[in-house]
Amino acid sequence: MRLLIILAQYHPALNPNVYRWRAIATHWIAQGHEVHVLCTKRSGLPDEAVLEGVQIHRAGQNSLLDWFYNLLYITRRRGEAGGDLPSRHGALRKGLEKLVDIGWRSLYWPDGRCLWHRPGKKRALHLLKTYPFDGMISVGAPFTAHLIGLACKRSDKRLKWLVDIEDPFAFVDAYFINNRLLYRRLNFRAEAAVLEAADAIAVTVDTAKETYGHYFPGIETNVTVVPPLFDPTLVAAPDFDGFEPGCIHLSYLGAFYAPIRTPDAALKLLNLLLERHPEFQPRLRIHFFGEIEYAVKAAFEQYPRLLPNLHLHGLVEREQVAAAMANTTFLLNIGNTTTYNLPSKSADYLASGKPVIHLSASEPDTFVAFMADHPMLLSLKTEAIGAEATDLLAKFLADFENRQLSAEAIEARIKPYRAAQIAEAYLRMLE
């Protein structure tokens, strides 16, 4: 099959959509399919390129801030390994973000990727004339990707179109997408148009399917749940030396998205742990791998007791993440406040076989449901962080230090989430 994937960013950007769809695209290439990716421009990279057999077409800007980056030829940027850590955010970056927050964010539609819409649509329609595609997948967020897909579908109604919803759009009120006072009705009309035109729709969790059925009655019959992906081809960096021997390493891998996922509850819990159980102070090392925005950084500074134990690594290459996961003693997961999102790293956490400490912020909790009967999972409610939760954590750390599931147990649990199974599920939806 000849396939077109429309998503805002591709390599070298590091985010869940890139991880997921790069693994799927390379798997399809290995199977003999022809895969094209339409994404946004990036200074220093050609608009047309081939990576791992995937034909990449770049058009338009990812965001207003990225437009500034490209204009000024800035190569160290957010969302990429080696991008600035919070302490390095200069006056120019902070000024640009403030300008975006005050003016741009209150007006743009449908989302912060709207600068991509017109050039992306133009490029996509040109690709449709050049290549007779057998199927097309648009990946959102951002919703802008689906609007480009909708234009392609209207141009060629015979083209099979799969709408992949990693994050919902119109009904989301837990975090900012656009100015709902201005655009709420337009948001629902636009998403309804996309859902009605799509040949197939994918979401990552059952609760998302149920929520879509509530807001768009009848659409759930066209929705398939395709869960998070584990990429078995990812190899840990052999030169990883980020962990001090003889210590208890607790690692959080991923980003924060205020207000639905913040580090506050985890920091409060760990601060209480060192207060009530000072025996952990000399050995406990707390690692955060992932981009930490300047506004989120303030939460870490509220707990001076933790500072000697904290290690903020920033955004690193996936090989470094894999090495950290392989070498850590415990994994930390911080749940979303929403009930219709499942963190993409859930499959990676499951595949690690490591003990997991989870802070639950919603009911139902999609991560708890995903981990099911995991024998080394400690789940604590964020609203109940106190002495009892702290003592449970201390016991868990003592009981499960250096424990790991067997290779057989890991394989049995992770098999449905391997790249091959996920890629095949998408292909079936395009048949």
Give, region by region, the residue ranges found by the protein language model:
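Acidic donor-binding loop of glycosyltransferase active sites
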Residues: 199, 325-340
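Membrane-proximal helix-turn-helix segments that form the acceptor-binding/catalytic region
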Residues: 23-24, 111, 122, 144-147, ...
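N-terminal subdomain of nucleotide-sugar transferases
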Residues: 1-65, 200, 206, 273, ...
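A short, active-site helix/loop in glycosyltransferases that binds the activated sugar's phosphate group
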Residues: 194-222, 426
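Nucleotide-activated donor-binding/catalytic signature segment of Leloir-type glycosyltransferases, i.e.
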Residues: 283, 287-320
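Conserved donor-binding/catalytic core segment of Leloir-type glycosyltransferases
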Residues: 242-261, 267-270, 422
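A conserved catalytic-core segment of Leloir-type glycosyltransferases
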Residues: 40-118
